[in-house]
Amino acid sequence: ERVVVNQMHRSPGVFFDHDKGKTHSSGKLLFNCRIIPGRGSWLDFEFDPKDILYFRIDRKKKLPVTTILLALGYDKKKIIETFHTISKYTFDKDTKMWITDFNPENFKRPIKISHDLVDAKNKKVVLNKGEKLNYVIAKKLKEKSLDKIILNSKDILGKYLSTDVKDNNGQVIIKAGFDINEEILEKIISNEIKVLDLVDIDPINKGPYLLETLKVDKCNSKTDALNEIYKVLRPGEAPTTQIAEDLFKNLYFDKDRYDLSEVGRVKLNSKLNLDFKNRKTILNTDDIIAILKFMLDLRDGRGEVDDIDHLGNRRVRSVGELVENQFRIG
């Protein structure tokens, strides 16, 4: 005879948590996220102590999170533009300065500016280095017709490139995602680069975590990313591009092999403020992008983690469901 008892387990959905400072000696909080389906492979996202963002499939070897975005068809430029605001910087030959648009939206959270704010029209300083700048002040400056500001070359040090920088022959001399240091700045000046697309990064309010992750990612294309994921899931086997792509699609985007469940979909939509009309029980690109944005917000001090032990995040597996699972295994 066999007795079957109802089981309580984690409810399907997406859950955000941190290690409570136990992993790193400094007590730094390392945030993580897990997507638990009703049936199928688990998908985890996690920060390491260096603020690099990784993902794992079924708790296997971790890979940089940009690898999964490349596998979804994004290129590096699109990855950066999805998560960050990009500003165009134009080099002015006469003044030897860089000119860019002044956008109050970049100052939603107050900062102390790291350089003088100079009006490009009249070359007057409107705010001195070290002064406080917030959205209200920025909006007033914009209303007073501050449209463009100028910066000297040293002021763009530390900013990240959103696109590859090419020389006059079309050769890539600096890859997208790298921050401008003295050496890179010298390359930009010596190659007479006139226009740069730079990421608006403010270390206090929005960190460069995804940009730093791009640096450690060895993959440069969708094919590279699919092959890298295949190697983790099927070590020792040499994949073709089609086999690698089929394996990746079957993981989370095939309703026969993956089922987030209706409860999981509702919880995911609710947590991430996604389209409530979406009732599909497979993952899509928008889900993964929204989850990564939430993870980045958590690291920047916005949003709250979930209580894994709360009974609202648990559900009862009935006897019928347990029997159904045994039949599926058979």
Give a label for each model feature.
Residues E1-G330:
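N-terminal non-catalytic structural scaffold regions of very large proteins
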